[in-house]
UniProtKB/Swiss-Prot annotation:
Gene from which this protein is expressed: lepA
tr-type G domain sequence ranges: 17-198
Protein name according to UniProt: Elongation factor 4
Xref: Gene3D superfamilies: 3.30.70.240, Elongation factor 4, C-terminal domain (3.30.70.2570), Elongation Factor G (Translational Gtpase), domain 3 (3.30.70.870), P-loop containing nucleotide triphosphate hydrolases (3.40.50.300), Translation factors (2.40.30.10)
Reactions performed catalytically: GTP + H2O = GDP + phosphate + H(+)
Length: 619
């Protein structure tokens, strides 16, 4: 067993040869945060009495869902063969929506621990992050976690991992994050296998931002990895992508609580506080340099995160609109990938059109708005960005079905995605059938082992963002895992389907869909609304239309009042007169009457799953 470091290296005065920067790559639920907890305990940076499960996941949603959303960086001392080392563990998100954050975290490291559940084997998203790590030429340490589980099959999955990375099955370490078995051997392996950082200590300072977090009291806390030179407190620094300059008010390392230091030298990982109040000022992937002696070239690899999925968010109570605006402004401080603009809908009132990285991002933002700011929201069906070329060659970018141009259209381009699906061999047929139905093109298939297959498809992004994942899980009994990334676009035969209530268009229900699926969408939506809209005193037609052509129709039957109840016997002409009068009244009502769509109908009709219908039922 390696003892705890007796005199740990001091930040800003640490020789790069004793620094080890590494991250943990793992799928959701494979035990990454639990293993991180054991490392914090083994290295003694967290006292046993302060320990709590998932120590590094600070957000409530992170702890409840058991996922990591924001990256964290922790400095831990560890001693091997009498030499004291400083280990910097950078905790990365495991979900596909946060791939850009993962790639920046990987760029800050020299090595990665590939953590795989010994009872489940490798998943699609872990594979995607593993390929990212290999692109960054990181030293990979394969590790099987949860070996204490009764269902664990370490020998089988060790062989699978070994064939993937190209090592021997004996080289795959076996640990248990729960009991702590093998954690110390893993820390020793980190020191021995991962190289120390390379960098020029005398060059002008260059540091890469791999995360920034908004703190209510101190403004934005920026996490950086220093590549060249050094950063000291009270000096002026410059962000290379925006050219803005700031004074460093505080500089330090997380261990795992923030500890101010006298600076950060080449190869070290720590945090900076400049008093900035907005995360957009310190962008993930940007390069920080000294203002007086700036570096000539940035570190490269920086890109603005692009929203892939758009959805309208509207408060159920219209008076909550200012609260929603403030709430989005606050979330934006901590989430540079969030974009939004105000939008009005005839049916739903005032709200925002919000851009997200993916469906999980959408769900998390919505949940945080509802939970942290106590808002009740309706979100419209998610859609992607289309490029529409009209006949006069004008190109229109459409993020909302209501922006889809009328009249003659030359072509519509839709974004595509490369999807990787890992699935047990017996479900290949079901998965291929689903992807074919979603207009996907098969790109390739590889057997990872005798039982598990990796299938690659090129598939329209619009098909993935709606309910693809739910259907994939139900067809494979929950065994499939999916990873996707945006990959070009293609020309497609897309049309806008409008829903008309008594001849009037309801903008919230419009959808852009493939011509082959338009009829199915129309029938589904008209059928749903027929059940949800209350009956009127007159017949109400619900129609689905493409342009001026009606493709589906349902009628809501009229409620009929019995006007003859007061006639006991008597002449037939008296009864006829009353019936004619009722008929006239209904005709007049139909001309002037407006159908109000109740709020519950919107919630139920716009939810792709049963959740909205349940919510409506509660009301």
């Amino acid at each position: 067993m390696s003892p705890l470091a007796s005199n740990p290296p001091v930040p800003a005065a640490t020789d790069p040869s004793v620094i080890r920067n590494f991250c943990i790559i793992a799928h959701i639920d494979h035990g990454k945060s639990t293993l991180a907890d054991r490392m914090l305990q083994a290295t003694g940076v967290v006292q046993p009495r302060d320990m709590k499960a998932q120590y590094l996941d600070r957000m409530d949603i992170e702890r409840e869902r058991g996922i990591t959303i924001k990256s964290q960086a922790v400095r831990m001392p560890w001693s091997v063969d009498g030499v004291d080392y400083a280990l910097n563990m950078i905790d990365t998100p495991g979900h596909v929506d946060f791939t850009y954050e993962v790639s920046r975290s990987l760029a800050a490291c020299e090595g990665a621990i590939l953590l795989v559940d010994a009872a489940q084997g490798i998943e699609a998203q872990t594979l995607a992050n593993l390929y990212l790590a290999m692109e960054h030429e990181l030293e990979i340490i394969p590790v099987l976690n949860k070996i204490d589980l009764p269902a664990a099959d370490p020998d089988r999955y060790a062989a699978e991992l070994a064939s993937l990375i190209g090592c021997e099955p004996e080289d795959v370490l076996r640990v248990s994050g729960k009991t702590g078995v093998g954690v110390e051997e893993l820390l020793d392996r980190v020191v021995r296998a991962i190289p120390g950082p390379e960098g020029d200590a005398d060059a002008p300072a260059r540091a890469m931002i791999f995360d920034s977090v908004y703190d209510t009291y101190r403004g934005v806390v920026t996490y950086v990895r220093v590549v060249d030179g050094r950063l000291s407190p009270r000096e002026k620094v410059r962000m290379m992508s925006t050219g803005t300059t700031y004074e460093l008010l505080e500089i330090g390392v997380s261990s795992p609580e923030p500890v101010p230091t006298k600076g950060l030298a080449a190869g070290e990982v720590g945090y900076l506080i400049t008093g900035v109040k907005d995360v957009r000022q310190s962008k993930v992937g940007d390069t920080v340099t000294n203002h007086a002696h700036p570096a000539e070239q940035s570190l490269g690899g920086y890109e603005d995160p692009k929203p892939m999925v758009f959805s309208g968010l509207y408060p159920i109570d219209g008076s909550d609109y200012p609260v929603l605006r403030d709430a989005l402004d606050k979330l934006k401080l901590n989430d540079a990938a969030l974009v939004y603009e105000p939008e009005t809908s005839v049916a739903l009132g005032f709200g925002f059109r919000v851009g997200f990285l993916g469906l999980l991002h959408l769900e998390i933002v919505r949940e945080r708005l509802e939970r942290e700011f106590d808002l009740d929201l309706i979100s419209t069906a998610p859609n992607v960005v289309y490029e529409v070329t009209r006949e006069d060659r004008e190109v229109v970018t459409v993020t909302n079905p209501s922006e889809f141009p009328e009249g003659k259209i030359l072509e519509v381009r839709e974004p595509m995605a490369s999807a990787t699906i890992i699935v047990p061999a017996e479900f290949i047929g079901a998965v291929m059938e689903l992807c074919q139905a979603k207009r996907g093109n098969l790109k390739g298939m590889d057997y990872l082992s005798e039982e598990r297959v990796e299938i690659r498809y090129w598939i329209p992004l619009a098909e993935i963002v709606f309910d693809f994942f739910d259907q994939l899980k139900s067809r494979t009994k929950g065994y499939a895992s999916l990873d996707w990334k945006a990959d070009g676009d293609q020309v497609a035969d897309l049309v806008k389907v409008d829903i008309l209530l008594q001849g009037e268009q309801v903008d919230a229900f419009s959808s852009i869909t493939h011509r082959d699926n338009a009829y199915a969408y129309g029938v589904m939506m008209t059928g749903k609304l027929k059940e949800l809209i209350p009956r009127q005193q007159y017949e109400v037609p619900i129609q689905a239309a493409i342009g001026s052509r009606i493709i589906a129709r349902e009628n809501i039957r009229a409620i009929r009042k019995d006007v003859l109840s007061k006639c006991y016997g008597g002449d037939i002409s008296r009864k006829r007169k009353l019936l004619e009068k009722q008929k006239e009244g209904k005709k007049r009502m139909k001309m002037v009457g407006r159908v109000e769509v109740p709020q519950e109908a919107f919630i139920a009709a716009l939810s792709s799953d049963g959740a909205g219908a349940d919510q409506a039922a509660k009301k």
